[in-house]
C-alpha cells in the first residue's frame, strides 16, 4: 500500500553511531536547501537508531527532498527516504517529548549562563584570563592556513566517495553558488565557486567542519589567489 505524500519524511539506513545533536545539524544542513524545516526528530532508542523524521512546512519541499536525496551517501551509507505514515500518533508523541526535553535543556543552559555572568561580575580579575584560556584551548583554526577572502573556496579532507552532485547539493543552498570543480586523481580536495567573496564566506562559515562521513570533517578555506 502506497503512503500518501505529506509534510513529514521518514529516513532510515543511517549510520547509528552518530551523536544525536550532530545528526540533527547535518540533516538540517542537507534538507533545508529544499524548504523551511519545521523540526527534525531523531531519537537514540534501540528501535529508532539509524532513523529520523524531517518535518517540512510545505508539502512540495518534502516531495522534492525525497526525490533528490533518495540514496544520498550520508555518513558513508545511502539514505532510504519515504513519506511518513499519515495519521501517525507516534510522530506526534515523539515530537512532543522531544520538544519538552529541548525546553528543559534550554532553561538549564539559561540558568548556567546567568550564574556564570554573575560569577564573572563578582570576580572581574578572573574573567579575562579564563576567557583567553578557553579560546586558546578550542581554536583549531591555526591548523588550517587561510588566505584572504576569495570567491572560490578550497575544500579538503573529503571522503573517497565524494562526487560533484553531493557537493553541489550541500553548497547550492547558499546564494551566489556557481559550480563545483573536482580535481582529477584527487578525491580528497575540491573547489567551489561563488559569484563574490561575501557569498563564498557565508557558505564557508556555515559548512565548516560538516561531516559527510564520521571520519571526514570537511575543511574549508578561501582558495589561494
UniProtKB/Swiss-Prot annotation:
This is U2 small nuclear ribonucleoprotein B''. The modification N6-acetyllysine is found at residue 111. Patients with systemic lupus erythematosus produce antibodies which interact with snRNP proteins. Pfam families: RRM_1. Residues 99-145 are annotated as: Disordered. PANTHER family: U1 SMALL NUCLEAR RIBONUCLEOPROTEIN A/U2 SMALL NUCLEAR RIBONUCLEOPROTEIN B. Identified in the spliceosome B complex. Identified in the spliceosome C complex. Present in a spliceosome complex assembled in vitro, and composed of SNRPB2, HPRP8BP and CRNKL1. Contributes to the binding of stem loop IV of U2 snRNA with SNRPP1. It comes from Homo sapiens (Human). Residues 127-141 have a biased composition (Polar residues).
Amino acid at each position: 500500500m502506497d503512503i500518501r505524500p505529506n509534510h513529514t519524511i521518514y529516513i532510515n539506513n543511517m549510520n547509528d553511531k552518530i551523536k544525536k545533536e550532530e545528526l540533527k545539524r547535518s540533516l538540517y544542513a542537507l534538507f533545508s536547501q529544499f524548504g523551511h524545516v519545521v523540526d527534525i526528530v531523531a531519537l537514540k532508542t534501540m528501535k529508532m537508531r539509524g532513523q529520523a523524521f524531517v518535518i517540512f512546512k510545505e508539502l512540495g519541499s518534502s516531495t522534492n527532498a525525497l526525490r533528490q536525496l533518495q540514496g544520498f551517501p550520508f555518513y558513508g551509507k545511502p539514505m532510504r527516504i519515504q513519506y511518513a505514515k499519515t495519521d501517525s500518533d507516534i510522530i506526534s508523541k515523539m515530537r512532543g517529548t522531544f520538544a519538552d526535553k529541548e525546553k528543559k535543556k534550554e532553561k538549564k543552559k539559561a540558568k548556567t549562563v546567568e550564574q556564570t555572568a554573575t560569577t564573572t561580575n563578582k570576580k572581574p580579575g578572573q574573567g579575562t584570563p579564563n576567557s583567553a584560556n578557553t579560546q586558546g584551548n578550542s581554536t583549531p583554526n591555526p591548523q588550517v592556513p587561510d588566505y584572504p577572502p576569495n570567491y572560490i573556496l578550497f575544500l579538503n579532507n573529503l571522503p573517497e566517495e565524494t562526487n560533484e552532485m553531493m557537493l553541489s547539493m550541500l553548497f547550492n543552498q547558499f546564494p551566489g553558488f556557481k559550480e563545483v570543480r573536482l580535481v582529477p586523481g584527487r578525491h580528497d580536495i575540491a573547489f567551489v565557486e561563488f559569484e563574490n567573496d561575501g557569498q563564498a564566506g557565508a557558505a564557508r562559515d556555515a559548512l565548516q567542519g560538516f561531516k559527510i562521513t564520521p571520519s571526514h570533517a570537511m575543511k574549508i578555506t578561501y582558495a589561494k589567489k
